[in-house]
Amino acid sequence: MASPEAPEHVVQFALDKLGGLDYLVLNHVGGAPAGMRARSAQATRGLLQAPPSSGSRPRPGLRLRPVTRGRCLQVNLLSYVQLTSRALPSLTDSKGSLVVVSSLLGRVPTSFSTPYSAAKFALDGFFGSLRRELDVQDVDVAITMCVLGLRDRAPAAQGVRGVTRAMASPGPRAALAVIRGGATRAPGVFYPWRFHLLCLLRGWLPRPRAWFIRQDLNISAAAAA
């Protein structure tokens, strides 16, 4: 998904092979490490910088390492938009569903995750707005936003090892929650369930919410990261 051309090719391949789409599950991300340095302007620029297309020449002095390309805006947001735009006509015909796998950090900001949280908030804003647009146009395409935490089999767990005390949830159970949410056309999925409470506390009781988040952080490890 780091290539601007890849999302359209992926959807077109699926349409050619399957003849149409009933579900589109978006579950990919270019991760960012947690820690004090992750909030720097340079780290954020690395996350949000789209890679040059295959037909363009990179600017002198600009070299995007593979790990940087994996964190770019193309992977974290634009590819989601491209995949959705290309698949939406087919999903409209089938009255299908969009399932967007996101993170708690796209609803509740926490410490030492500035670039990653920025990308996830952008996803929540885009698909929240798209849901409203489809509704007012009477387009019967469901959008399910999945708010997940750390999974024990996810690469993202390695990026926060030692920084957070939060326990990783079993990956298969998180996958089952996503499948159920998409199949039932639920507007939102929270796994573990307590994340729904944290999202509610964000507006109602910000101080207790901040206290809960702080308990899961290892400040000294984050400072050294």
What function would you assign to each model-found segment?
Residues 84, 119:
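Active-site helix of classical SDR
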Residues 103:
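Residue(s) in the substrate-gating loop at a strand-loop-helix junction
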Residues 132-193:
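SDR active-site lid
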